[in-house]
């Protein structure tokens, strides 16, 4: 049983199309090759739904990071980019935090960011970001669907992409939830 699979078994996708920003997550919690729960909620809204965050990795670690992010967002008056950079600095340098094994996607009206325990804050190209074991499947599907002019909304693209990821990744499922940045 690989600990790496236990820590990263999920799919989180965030995309922006026509000023609409959606973040989606599957509901599966796995430990190794065992499904512990199929209806987990891996997304959180912050600052009255103006900021949304999703995590992949250890559940306890992800929740701890949400709490730290909320504090940073309040400290920096809802400035997501500055809050993310400050969280990443703490995450990398603090003895306790640097042991946390999770990744996050956070988004507001202006930014989609990937945060890692290595201290990385990455703003992805093409207005699409994904993390977790099914992340590359969801990312590929979303980029393909967004690469040509189509009538699909951001939410429809996210749901189709997440379903493709759930079909391919055994650590992700079809219990998909979405949140929209307002």
Curated annotation (Swiss-Prot):
Subcellular location: Cytoplasm
Entry annotation: catalytic residues: 10
Positions with a binding annotation for Na(+): 166, 169, 172
Gene3D superfamilies: Glutamine Phosphoribosylpyrophosphate, subunit 1, domain 1
EC number: 3.4.25.2
Catalytic activities: ATP-dependent cleavage of peptide bonds with broad specificity
One example of a Gene Ontology biological process annotation: proteolysis involved in protein catabolic process
GO molecular function terms attached to this record: metal ion binding; threonine-type endopeptidase activity
Predominant location: cytoplasm
Name of the protein in its database record: ATP-dependent protease subunit HslV
Name of the gene: hslV
């Amino acid at each position: 049983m690989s600990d790496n699979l236990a820590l990263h078994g999920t799919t989180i996708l965030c995309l922006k199309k026509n000023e609409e920003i959606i973040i989606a997550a599957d509901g599966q919690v796995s430990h190794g090759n065992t499904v512990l729960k199929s209806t987990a909620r891996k997304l959180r809204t912050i600052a009255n739904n103006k900021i949304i965050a999703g995590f992949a990795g250890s559940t306890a670690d992800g929740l701890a990071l949400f709490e730290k992010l909320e504090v940073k967002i309040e400290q920096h008056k809802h400035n997501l980019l500055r809050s993310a950079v400050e969280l990443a600095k703490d995450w990398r340098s603090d003895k306790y935090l640097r042991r946390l094994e999770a990744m996050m996607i956070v988004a507001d009206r202006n930014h989609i960011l990937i945060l890692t325990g290595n201290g990385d804050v990455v703003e992805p190209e093409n207005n699409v970001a994904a993390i977790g074991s099914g992340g590359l499947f969801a990312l590929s599907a979303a980029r393909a669907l967004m690469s040509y002019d189509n009538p699909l909304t951001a939410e429809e693209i996210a749901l189709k992409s997440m379903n493709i990821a759930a079909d391919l990744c055994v650590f992700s499922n079809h219990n998909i939830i979405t949140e929209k940045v307002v």
